[in-house]
C-alpha cells in the first residue's frame, strides 16, 4: 500500500485521519511537502513532448507504480486538493505522453482511496473533489474503492468527527483482513 500525503502541514488533521486508516498496515508513505514537484508547461502536443524537469516527480511516480493500492490524502484547500497534490497529479500528463513509461497500463486496476479533511461543511463541499478523483482514476483505468471525508479545521479537531473516525477504522479493518488472505 502506498500513501501520498498532500498536506503542507506536518501532523495535521488529514495525516491523523490517514494514519488511523492505515494503522498496523504495511505501507510506504510519501509526504509531498518534503519533495520538489514543479509545475510544468503543457507540451503534450509538441513534437518533442515535455522537456526534462530536474525534480522528484519521476522517482515518486516510480515508487507509486510499485504498489497495487494507493491512498491520496489531501486537505480540502479552497474546495479542491492541495497545491502539492495538484502538481503531482498534473504531472501525470507528462507520464502519459512518454509512451516508454507505460503509465496508463501500470495504473490500470490499481485500487484507489481518498482521504480529505477540511472545514466549512466538507461532507458536502468536498464531494466535487471526490468526483474529480473518480474521473482521474477512471481515466487511467484504476478502481476507486472509497473515501473518507473528515470535518476538522483546528489542530487535532479530527478527533471530534466520530463518523470519519468510524469509517477510517472500517477501512483499517478491511485492509487488515485483506492482508491475511
Residue ranges and their predicted role:
Residues 8-11, 76-79, 119-123, 153-156:
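Short histidine/acidic/glycine/proline-rich micro-motifs that form metal-
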Amino acid at each position: 500500500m502506498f500513501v501520498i500525503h498532500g498536506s503542507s502541514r506536518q501532523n495535521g488533521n488529514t495525516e491523523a485521519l490517514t494514519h488511523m486508516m492505515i494503522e498496523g498496515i504495511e505501507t510506504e508513505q510519501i509526504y509531498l511537502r518534503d519533495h520538489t514537484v514543479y509545475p510544468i508547461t503543457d507540451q503534450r502536443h509538441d513534437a518533442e513532448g515535455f522537456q526534462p524537469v530536474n525534480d522528484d516527480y519521476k522517482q515518486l511516480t516510480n515508487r507509486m507504480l510499485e504498489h497495487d493500492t494507493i491512498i491520496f490524502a489531501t486537505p480540502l484547500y479552497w474546495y479542491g486538493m492541495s497545491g502539492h497534490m495538484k502538481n503531482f497529479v498534473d504531472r501525470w500528463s507528462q507520464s502519459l505522453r512518454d509512451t516508454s513509461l507505460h503509465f496508463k497500463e501500470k495504473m490500470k486496476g490499481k485500487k484507489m482511496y481518498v482521504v480529505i479533511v477540511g472545514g466549512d461543511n466538507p461532507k458536502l463541499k468536498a464531494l466535487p473533489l471526490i468526483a474529480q478523483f473518480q474521473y482521474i482514476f477512471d481515466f487511467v483505468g484504476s478502481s476507486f474503492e472509497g473515501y473518507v471525508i473528515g470535518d476538522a479545521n483546528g489542530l487535532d479537531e479530527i478527533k471530534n468527527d466520530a463518523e470519519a473516525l468510524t469509517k477510517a477504522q472500517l477501512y483499517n479493518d478491511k485492509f487488515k483482513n485483506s492482508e491475511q488472505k
